[in-house]
């Protein structure tokens, strides 16, 4: 994370992140800025928050251009089970350039068994350059997912 800072006693300080988003608002498409700056997507008490949600799938696709099967792009589709287990949160990244998944062998935070990556602790969106954005996600295991993309979709499906 570049703008969301961990507190020494636990938790995260979003103040610098909110300021950063204000400073880059004009360079983000409205729907990406709306997602990034909506406190509901970060708030521990919001049912729509990614905080405490569980990753269920992270699919990397290479769809072919209908005009030429040789031309392909990278797309990532993610599905999270909401923290109250009553909804799915879908994130879709189009025009993906760089993407990384880093997971430590040992867990950073308890519980330490049979939890996969654990719950999502915090996430932030950033501007990489004109037309390219990054979404970084940190999980309780210590896993970090990073996607650089040109287009983004977000939707919620109630169960």
Task: Annotate each language-model stretch with its function.
Residues 1-159:
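Surface-exposed, interaction-prone regions used to assemble/regulate multi-protein complexes
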């Amino acid at each position: 994370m570049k703008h969301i800072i961990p507190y020494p006693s636990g938790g995260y300080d979003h103040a610098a992140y909110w300021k950063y988003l204000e400073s880059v608002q004009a360079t983000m498409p409205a729907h990406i800025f709306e997602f990034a700056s909506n406190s509901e997507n970060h708030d521990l008490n919001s049912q729509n928050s990614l905080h405490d949600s569980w990753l269920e799938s992270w699919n990397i696709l290479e769809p072919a251009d209908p005009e030429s099967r040789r031309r392909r792009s990278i797309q990532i589709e993610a599905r999270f089970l909401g923290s109250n287990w009553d909804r799915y949160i879908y994130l879709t990244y189009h025009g993906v350039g760089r993407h990384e998944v880093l997971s430590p062998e040992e867990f950073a935070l308890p519980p330490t068994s049979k939890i996969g990556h654990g719950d999502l602790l915090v996430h932030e969106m950033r501007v990489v350059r004109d037309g390219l954005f990054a979404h970084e996600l940190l999980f309780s295991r210590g896993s970090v997912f990073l996607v650089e993309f040109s287009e983004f979709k977000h939707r919620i499906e109630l169960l």
